């Protein structure tokens, strides 16, 4: 996804054919929901790729897993009149209105990794999370031989990958009455949170076969 992200953005803006105009500047705002390691790498690759094109400026702001911060960040980019906005939404419901606001003002919006709750954006770059959930469900069925109890640790409640992966998992397990989701907890996409909740659940549920 990261490899082709900026190319998609530049194509949307028409920059690839107009960068020869020395005095033309394009300002891209990036609103990241989090600052984990793979997002740092994504940010680095976006900035690095932008260096190959004259007149492209990239500014990145990180919400640190806080939807209020992200709403402020996106409004900041709107006020700065960015030429294009890239958003990795923290929570779909909370961030949807401000993304729609940017789109309604004529700012091209590329939504990455996580979706919003409407189609008022220019493009989406991300995975098929329902299919990922189904694949995990099928792996569980094969691994447990169709019988057992599992603990599901989701991503941040309210983020579309977490919702869609849970939906895909549940769909895959519908035809498997021998497999029970004994507990489902919100790991918030954070290893420390997920680890703490997993330890707590496993202490009280010794019969869980798979996490």
Cite the ranges covered by each PLM segment.
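Positively charged n-region of N-terminal signal peptides that target proteins for export
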Residues: 1-4
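Bacterial N-terminal signal peptides
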Residues: 7-15
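A residue-level marker of the well-folded mature domains of exported/periplasmic proteins
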Residues: 19-211
């Amino acid at each position: 996804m990261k490899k082709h992200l900026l190319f998609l953005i530049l194509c949307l803006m028409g920059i690839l054919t107009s960068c020869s105009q020395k005095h033309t500047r394009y300002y891209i705002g990036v609103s990241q929901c989090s600052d984990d390691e793979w997002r740092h790498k994504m940010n680095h690759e976006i900035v690095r790729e932008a260096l190959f094109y004259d007149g492209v400026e990239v500014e990145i702001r990180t919400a640190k897993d806080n939807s209020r911060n992200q709403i402020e960040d996106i409004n900041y980019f709107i006020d700065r009149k960015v030429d294009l906005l890239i958003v990795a939404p923290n929570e779909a419901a909370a961030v949807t209105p401000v993304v729609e606001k940017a789109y309604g003002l004529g700012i091209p919006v590329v939504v990455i990794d996580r979706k919003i709750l409407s189609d008022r954006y220019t493009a989406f770059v991300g995975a098929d999370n329902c299919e990922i959930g189904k694949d995990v469900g099928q792996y569980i069925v094969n691994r447990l031989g169709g019988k057992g109890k599992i603990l599901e640790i989701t991503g941040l409640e309210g983020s579309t990958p977490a919702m869609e992966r849970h939906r895909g998992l549940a769909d895959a397990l519908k035809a498997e009455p021998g497999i029970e989701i004994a507990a489902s907890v919100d790991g918030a996409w954070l290893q420390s949170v997920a680890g703490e909740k997993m330890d707590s659940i496993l202490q009280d549920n010794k019969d869980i076969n798979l996490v």
